[in-house]
Regions:
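Peripheral interaction segments used for macromolecular assembly
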Residues: 1-176
Length: 176
């Protein structure tokens, strides 16, 4: 099984997670990312996998050896401790999908995008790319624009930097 360079997260929902001996560990339920305060794309920390008994565990991306659209291959020892979301962590399927964000039009400043009905889009899917040394980052976002009169709007794939609303707000320090 070869590792895909880019994978869309919603297509992985429910995919089987296997160990090197082809025994099923569980099924993928979500992907954990770390949103950043700067304009850098979120970094993928790991997978939330549902094992026997509907128990959800965390598998770090360093243990993932291959990702395909239908299955995920992990190596090493898997810790079966129950997954608990930490502060600063964001679940892609639970928190990012169906979120309303602002689409930055070409020529518009990235931080001062005017929010209009036309520039507000809904996140439908998120693409993650493999970087060097087993690091994965969010690279592209599949969005849907608002349609007219209860119709679906146009959908398109945009780069992460072309949307506002998926980064953490910067902490302002005031001198008083």
């Amino acid at each position: 099984m070869s590792t895909a360079a880019r994978v869309f997260v919603a297509r992985l929902a429910g995919a089987g997670v296997f160990d090197p001996k082809a025994d099923q560990v569980g099924r993928l339920r979500d992907i954990v990312v770390l949103l950043r305060t700067d304009r850098k794309p979120p970094r993928v920390l790991g997978l939330v996998v549902e094992v026997v008994g509907r128990r959800r565990i965390f598998i770090p991306m360093t243990k993932v050896s291959a990702i395909d659209s239908h299955q995920i291959l992990v190596n090493g020892v898997v810790n079966l401790r129950r997954f608990e979301q930490r502060p600063g962590e964001t679940l892609v399927m639970a928190d990012l999908l169906d979120r309303h964000v602002t689409l930055v039009e070409p020529g518009e400043p990235k931080s001062d995008a005017a929010t209009t009905d036309r520039s507000t889009v809904t996140v439908m899917d998120v693409a993650i790319d493999r970087q060097a040394y087993s690091d994965w980052e969010v690279s592209q976002i599949y969005v849907r624009l608002k349609g007219r009169l209860r119709r679906r709007g146009e959908s398109r794939i945009v780069d992460f930097n072309d949307v506002n609303g998926l980064t953490l707000p910067t902490a302002e320090q005031g001198a008083e």
